[in-house]
């Protein structure tokens, strides 16, 4: 059965979905077992249903043939499996696919990036973003709300269903998930962590913890909490070799400076097995802003005590941005300086930029309700880790 993609016209015409049924996509395995316990069922029934949901992308209880008819009927009365719908699809000349996914009356964006040996899905965690990184299109849209567990894992579910339906086209199944889409994942831990647990669960998508990566700009208290909650690979959105530059392009640095951030990163490395002893440093290359050889020397000195590999990211432009992309020659010189210090340094290949699906280009459709409030809190009061 081919996967239906809802048109924007369909989405705008459809009434808002209001249901008192439990959306099983909101439940990790522990919560799923608790739910089945309330139905008077044994825990293995939860495992059976999860296997149908995630191994087969099944959202119809009647298709779950190893579940007895009485239980299927009971589930239809009190529960549902409802993933967010794709309302627009764009395909890049390089094979990258970007989906606009409806979450309520707004959209987030999810990107599928196939390569020879893997297929990576870039997943959003919030509707918009409050951190206001100056080089990122998402940040310019403002912030509306956190995504629910079902809206996060639902992006993976929906993509897996589409790619599965497209097997005849030779598309690779999803092998890696990166929490690098719209939003700051650490500002939505309550929903991001259960979603990642489902990604890792053998009855969920069964991914290795080394193949699920969370990227953060540096919400230090939440990073410390993350290390006590789950073990996944970590990517650090650093982007500057000193506080002066980072204060300007990554404003959260005014609250949690580089020294404080990297200390938290080292604490996480000490707790984590997924990172194999080192994290990934993400560094966007902005022409004559942070890409000089002097900046490379500063960065190498800064990171000497942090086990890491470094990804240099050619900046991807968006309308109204005040920056330019570093030239290949400047990126090459920068990379060679870092390698001379012994750092593994990779220049990230730009994918999907012809459909605005590249790093920093995701925008979605955001009603900005809380951006100014979050800005004030970043400048003064501590940022709380909030749920939906």
Curated annotation (Swiss-Prot):
Active site, UniProt feature: 109, 359
Positions that bind S-adenosyl-L-methionine: 183-184, 215, 237-239, 316
Binding site for [4Fe-4S] cluster: 129, 133, 136
Disulfide bonds: 122-359
Keyword hit for Kinase: no
Enzyme Commission designation: 2.1.1.192
Annotated protein name in UniProt: Dual-specificity RNA methyltransferase RlmN
Additional note from the record: Reaction proceeds by a ping-pong mechanism involving intermediate methylation of a conserved cysteine residue.
Keyword list, A-Z: 4Fe-4S, Cytoplasm, Disulfide bond, Iron, Iron-sulfur, Metal-binding, Methyltransferase, rRNA processing, S-adenosyl-L-methionine, Transferase, tRNA processing
Recorded catalytic activity of this chain's protein: adenosine(2503) in 23S rRNA + 2 reduced [2Fe-2S]-[ferredoxin] + 2 S-adenosyl-L-methionine = 2-methyladenosine(2503) in 23S rRNA + 5'-deoxyadenosine + L-methionine + 2 oxidized [2Fe-2S]-[ferredoxin] + S-adenosyl-L-homocysteine; adenosine(37) in tRNA + 2 reduced [2Fe-2S]-[ferredoxin] + 2 S-adenosyl-L-methionine = 2-methyladenosine(37) in tRNA + 5'-deoxyadenosine + L-methionine + 2 oxidized [2Fe-2S]-[ferredoxin] + S-adenosyl-L-homocysteine
The keyword Cytoplasm belongs to this UniProt entry's keyword annotation: yes
MF (Gene Ontology): 4 iron, 4 sulfur cluster binding; metal ion binding; rRNA (adenine(2503)-C2-)-methyltransferase activity; rRNA binding; tRNA (adenine(37)-C2)-methyltransferase activity; tRNA binding
Localisation: Cytoplasm
Alphabetized SUPFAM superfamilies for the sequence: Radical SAM enzymes
Coiled-coil stretches: none
Free-text cofactor note: Binds 1 [4Fe-4S] cluster. The cluster is coordinated with 3 cysteines and an exchangeable S-adenosyl-L-methionine.
Gene3D superfamilies registered for this protein in UniProt: 1.10.150.530, Aldolase class I
Family designation: Belongs to the radical SAM superfamily. RlmN family.
Required cofactor names: [4Fe-4S] cluster
Function statement: Specifically methylates position 2 of adenine 2503 in 23S rRNA and position 2 of adenine 37 in tRNAs. m2A2503 modification seems to play a crucial role in the proofreading step occurring at the peptidyl transferase center and thus would serve to optimize ribosomal fidelity.
Gene: rlmN
Stretches assigned to the Radical SAM core domain: 115-354
Source organism, top-level taxon: Bacteria
Protein's GO biological process: rRNA base methylation; tRNA methylation
Entry-linked InterPro entries: Aldolase_TIM, Methyltransferase_A, RlmN_N, RNA_MTrfase_RlmN, rRNA_lsu_MTrfase_RlmN/Cfr, rSAM
GO cellular component terms, semicolon-separated: cytoplasm
Organism: Cronobacter sakazakii (strain ATCC BAA-894)
């Amino acid at each position: 059965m081919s996967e239906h993609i809802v048109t924007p016209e369909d989405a705008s015409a459809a009434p808002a979905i209001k249901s008192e049924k439990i959306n099983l996509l909101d439940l990790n395995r522990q919560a799923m077992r608790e739910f089945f316990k309330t139905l008077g069922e044994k825990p293995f029934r939860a495992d059976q249903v999860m296997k149908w949901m995630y191994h087969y992308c099944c959202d119809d209880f009647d298709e779950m043939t190893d579940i007895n008819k009485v239980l299927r009927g009971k589930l239809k009365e009190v529960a549902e499996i409802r993933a967010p719908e794709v309302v627009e699809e764009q395909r890049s000349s390089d094979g990258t696919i970007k989906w606009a996914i409806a979450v309520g009356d707004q959209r987030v964006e999810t990107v599928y990036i196939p390569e020879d040996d893997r297929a990576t899905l870039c997943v959003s965690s919030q509707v918009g973003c409050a951190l206001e990184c100056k080089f990122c299109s998402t940040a310019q849209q403002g912030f509306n709300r956190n995504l629910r567990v079902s809206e996060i894992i639902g992006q993976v579910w929906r993509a897996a269903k589409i790619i599965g339906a497209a097997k005849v086209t030779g598309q690779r199944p999803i092998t890696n998930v990166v929490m690098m889409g719209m939003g700051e994942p650490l500002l939505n831990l309550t929903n991001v962590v259960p979603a990642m647990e489902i990604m890792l669960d053998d009855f969920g998508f069964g991914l290795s913890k080394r193949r699920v990566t969370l990227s953060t700009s540096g919400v230090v208290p939440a990073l410390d909490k993350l290390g006590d909650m789950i073990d996944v690979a970590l990517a650090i959105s650093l982007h500057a070799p000193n506080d002066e530059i980072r204060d300007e392009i990554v404003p959260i640095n005014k609250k949690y400076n580089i020294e404080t951030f990297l200390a938290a990163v080292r604490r996480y490395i000490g707790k984590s097995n997924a990172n194999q002893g080192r994290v990934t440093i993400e560094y966007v290359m902005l022409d004559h802003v942070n890409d000089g050889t002097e900046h490379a020397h500063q960065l190498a000195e800064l990171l000497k005590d942090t086990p890491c590999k470094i990804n240099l990211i050619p900046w991807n432009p968006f309308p109204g941005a005040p920056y330019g992309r570093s030239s290949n020659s400047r990126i090459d010189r920068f990379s060679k300086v870092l390698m001379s210090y012994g750092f593994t340094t990779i220049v990230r290949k730009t994918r999907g930029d012809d459909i605005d699906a590249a790093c920093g280009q995701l925008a979605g459709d955001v009603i900005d309700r809380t951006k100014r409030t979050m800005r004030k809190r970043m400048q003064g009061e501590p940022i709380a880790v909030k749920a939906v």
